[in-house]
Regions:
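Extreme N-terminal leader/targeting segments of oxidoreductases
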Residues: 1-16, 34-35, 534-566
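A glycine-rich dinucleotide-binding beta-alpha-beta segment and adjacent secondary-structure elements
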Residues: 13, 72, 199-202, 240, ...
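N-terminal Rossmann-like FAD-binding beta1-loop-alpha1 element of flavoenzymes
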Residues: 16-41
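Glycine-rich loop(s) and the adjacent beta-strand/alpha-helix scaffold that form part
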Residues: 34, 38, 45-56, 208, ...
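Redox-cofactor-proximal catalytic regions of oxidoreductases
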Residues: 60-144
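FAD cofactor-binding and catalytic pocket of flavoenzymes
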Residues: 79, 98, 104, 118, ...
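Glycine-rich phosphate/pyrophosphate-binding beta-alpha loops
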Residues: 94, 506-518
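Conserved redox-cofactor binding core of oxidoreductases
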Residues: 120-232, 467-470
Length: 566
């Protein structure tokens, strides 16, 4: 005789379990905690203190996230068939390693891609952009450097000088570099801070406490409101528990034996593991028949922000382009394109191994042949590409982004180098514009900088040898849509076909933005969480002790920046 099913309430570890602690996960953690929910955040990476970051990226165990090689740093590198992806790892996600740049896209970005119909997304997100700016401490960069002056000259040559601007960034600036400033953002309720020293170390991990990483704002207050953060915890699967909740299976991410497997039970789940992490997890769960009702659009409409990364490297050591913040300025050569110069700090030369001599576009067959020809015709410069010494000081990196639509698909398949199991890879969908591995304006910018600095122009080696672009801003794969046929989630970030399952990270974005996407991810996360009801309507919001105000008020330097360089 079958025993009757128990009607007792199952024991839950939390109301909401959040997978990932980047921009989407951190916003979700704070706003759900404010609404009275018990929140648990699981993060595969480590928790970092300011003094723990590597002094240079030659300390690869602290810089790169390659657990198989016992490297547990903040920078992931993922090579797929169609793109090389740079992303972040650690409590705070991409904010630990990103270039601080927080920009609102051009209006046209909201009119392309697969944004859900029936909503004016520019208008809908406008108040959430303002909230995100306050929380992330967005201010204009107050100082330009030599690379920025060269970029301004390039903009002037194109007749686009009027579009050149210092970037809006999430950094604490002050009248004196390295000055202790208490908490200038949240009325003393936030962590103590130190002003920027312009060392250029934003993308290696800020060792001064000037960078407004998520552990200093959203996550800081989420934890003050009771949210729990468990670092070094990798989510391996999710499934319904049969009683209206969710089972989340995990293991320790930094162990190779005794992996500490554990299953958590939650009433709701927010997936915020970044585009690669979230899409891979959902594809794996569908493959294992744990989530069989997922949209067929899962894995599709993946975009790279149509990015190209190139630059120029001086032939002499008697220069220093590493001073400043990671990205200090940019301009629009046309309404669809944005160009920035990027820098690494002095001594952080390990990324030089991703560079080689610049060549123009072609196919996967012809472009390597062009590269070989360039190497033969410029043998000394070719040999210089193998010398990492003082690379960060000698190099000016160019980052170009476009909001023009192009996409590919993420899939799980057996790969030629490891046929024993399935892993994440990519393929192109018929009828979709391929992602660009070459943009003429990018090469034009690199050559201009090279001429002005006595340098040789350079490109990412994967772009010229494999015809595969590099992106630090992979988007989509679980993107918004009007129906399950054209999206994985609805306009409120709810996964089609499931209750209390959300996606809130870069994978939700349904189009190329053409600018650095962190501010948009934050604003869209604010929008998503604003739709979630209070846990107890009678209790109301658990407000922060003080409302976030305009970042750095009273200590921001004057805005008249352009006059310094014009």
């Amino acid at each position: 005789m079958a025993e009757p099913k128990s009607t007792a309430e199952p024991s839950y570890d939390c109301d909401f379990l959040i997978v990932g602690s980047g921009f989407g996960g951190s916003v979700s953690a704070l706003r759900l905690s404010e609404k009275g929910y018990d929140v648990l955040v699981l993060e595969a990476g480590k928790r970092w203190r300011t003094e723990d970051f590597p002094k240079t990226n030659w300390n690869v165990r602290k810089f790169l996230w390659l657990p198989a090689l016992f490297c547990y740093g903040i920078q992931r590198l993922t090579l797929l068939r169609d793109v090389l992806v740079l992303s972040g790892a650690g409590v705070g996600g991409g904010s630990l390693v990103y270039a601080n740049t927080l920009l609102v896209p051009q209006d046209e970005a909201f009119n392309r891609g697969t944004w859900p119909r029936g909503t004016d997304w520019k208008q809908a997100l406008a108040p959430h952009y303002e909230t995100a700016k306050r929380m992330l401490g967005v201010v204009p960069n107050p100082h330009l450097w030599e690379g920025d002056r060269i970029l301004l000259e390039f903009a002037r040559n194109l007749g686009k000088e009027d579009t050149f601007r210092p970037t809006n960034v999430g950094v604490l600036f002050g009248e004196r570099p390295g000055q202790s400033a208490g908490d200038p953002f949240f009325g003393g309720e936030g962590p103590e801070r130190t002003t920027c020293t312009y060392c250029g170390g934003c993308m290696v991990g800020c060792r001064h406490g000037a960078k407004n990483t998520l552990d200093k704002n959203y996550l800081w207050f989420a934890e003050k409101l009771g949210a729990k953060v468990r670092p070094e915890t990798l989510v391996t699967g999710i499934e319904e528990d049969g009683q209206g909740g969710w089972l989340v299976h995990t293991r320790r991410s930094t162990r190779h034996v005794f992996r500490g497997r554990r299953t958590f039970r939650a009433r709701g789940v927010v997936l915020a593991a970044g585009a690669l992490g979230t899409v891979n997890l959902l594809l794996k769960c569908r493959e294992q028949r744990r989530l069989t009702r997922l949209s067929p659009a899962l894995g599709g409409y993946v975009r790279t922000n149509s990015e190209i990364i190139c630059g120029a490297t001086a032939r002499t050591d008697e220069v220093d382009y590493s001073r400043g913040i990671a990205i200090a300025s940019g301009f629009h050569p046309d309404p669809d394109t944005y160009v920035e110069v990027v820098r690494y700090p002095k001594g952080s030369d390990v990324m030089s191994f991703l560079g080689t001599l610049l060549v123009d576009g072609g196919t996967r067959l012809t472009r390597p042949l062009k590269w070989l020809g360039t190497c033969l015709s410029h043998p000394l410069d070719f040999l210089r590409t193998f010398n990492p010494r003082h690379w960060a000081q000698r190099s000016t990196i160019v980052l170009v982004m476009q909001n023009l639509d192009s996409a590919f698909r993420l899939v799980r398949a057996r790969r030629w180098f490891w046929p024993f199991g399935r892993g994440l890879t990519s393929r192109r969908d018929p009828g979709q514009a391929p992602i660009p591995a070459y943009l003429p304006i990018a090469n034009q910018a690199a050559r201009h900088i090279a001429r002005q600095t006595g340098a040789f122009p350079s490109s990412s080696i994967n772009e010229v040898v494999l015809n595969v672009p590099t992106t630090a801003h992979i988007l989509g794969g679980a993107s918004m849509g009007t129906t399950p046929e054209d999206g994985v989630i609805d306009a409120r970030n709810r996964v089609f076909g499931y209750e209390n399952l959300y996606v809130v990270d870069g994978s939700m974005i349904p189009g190329n933005l053409g600018v650095n996407p962190s501010l948009t991810i934050t604003a869209m996360a604010e929008h998503a969480m604003s739709q979630v009801p209070l846990k107890d309507q009678r209790a109301g919001l658990r407000h922060l002790p003080v409302q976030a105000r305009a970042a750095g008020a009273g200590i921001v330097l004057p805005d008249a920046v352009l006059e310094q360089v014009l």
